[in-house]
């Protein structure tokens, strides 16, 4: 319903009849701080953040304000957002392997790196017909974790995004 929150009171009224939020961490953090300052209590079932890196202390601040767990999400406009999402273990994000093949490559050589090594996230989509993506270089810096997640899903685990890879002519800034 919302894009950028301009009226916190109106947004919080909407949350009283909601059970979750999906949004930008900065916007959700601003709502959490507004609630704390005005002693407003709203309990949700869960929060899904997207489109920006989120610090652990920000997660804790939001969880405290809304009395629920925060789940991080990795996605791109090009993939209709849904790339990978955290499970209840909160030890990384599981890629949607039925829809997306996710690789980590060395941005200099284009070769796949070992799990645990950082590189550029590259995706291939399986179900996009009009414009499939094949080894699409996202510009995001990340890594696949060596260890499987403790949850029961048998999916790879993408570590939290650690920045951007900038291309400048024949150089990369990592």
Identify the function of each model-found stretch.
Residues 2-174:
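Active-site glycine/GP-rich loop and adjacent strand/helix microenvironment
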């Amino acid at each position: 319903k919302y894009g950028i929150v301009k009226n916190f009171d109106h947004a919080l009224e909407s949350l009283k009849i909601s059970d979750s939020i999906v949004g930008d961490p900065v916007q959700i953090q601003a709502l959490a701080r507004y609630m704390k300052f005005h002693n407003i209590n709203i309990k949700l079932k869960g929060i899904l953040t997207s489109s920006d890196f989120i610090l652990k202390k920000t997660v804790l601040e939001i969880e405290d304000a809304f009395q629920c767990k925060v789940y991080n999400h990795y996605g791109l406009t090009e993939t209709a957002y849904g790339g990978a999402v955290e499970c209840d273990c909160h030890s990384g994000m599981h890629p949607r392997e039925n829809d997306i093949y996710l690789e980590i490559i060395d941005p200099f050589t284009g070769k796949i790196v070992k799990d645990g090594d950082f590189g550029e996230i590259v995706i291939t989509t399986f179900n996009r017909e009009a414009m499939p993506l094949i080894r699409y270089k996202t510009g995001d810096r990340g890594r696949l974790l060596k260890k499987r997640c403790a949850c029961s899903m048998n999916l790879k685990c993408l570590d939290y995004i650690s920045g951007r890879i900038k291309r400048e002519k024949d150089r990369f800034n990592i």
